[in-house]
């Protein structure tokens, strides 16, 4: 079994690669097993540096390259009569820290009947659909720099 251990920022245009479709849940993990479309089993033991986004490349130590694509999965799709109503739904779902995928005409989240009822209560339409899930990463994703000289901490006399 090939074990993929490296994340690649980019590959050369002539680089050969295979592809694998993974759910959002799997793409959040640094260690997983999966099967290629050909049925070949692969494994991953990647650095813990964030989510594998659709279109990401990973490689084995031997140089085999694999493109990771978002696999269609069961999601709740929120649509509205107006853009403002869709914005309100995004606000309410965001307040619940739900992984949320935004498009100009719809919101998508993982199945949750309580959230679906809440959104329907706001007057929006919720349907189930199969769609690749690529939620927003959030304001603090990949956020790892030092705040020791942050003006906000200095202003409020916060000590680390």
Curated annotation (Swiss-Prot):
GO biological process terms, alphabetically, are:
protein folding; protein-containing complex assembly; urea metabolic process
Q: Cellular component terms, GO, for this chain's entry?
A: cytoplasm
Q: Which keywords describe this protein according to UniProt?
A: Chaperone, Cytoplasm, Nickel
Q: Record's CDD domains?
A: UreE
Query: What HAMAP family does this protein's entry cite?
Result: UreE
Function summary: Involved in urease metallocenter assembly. Binds nickel. Probably functions as a nickel donor during metallocenter assembly.
Protein's name according to its UniProt entry: Urease accessory protein UreE
List the gene name. Answer: ureE
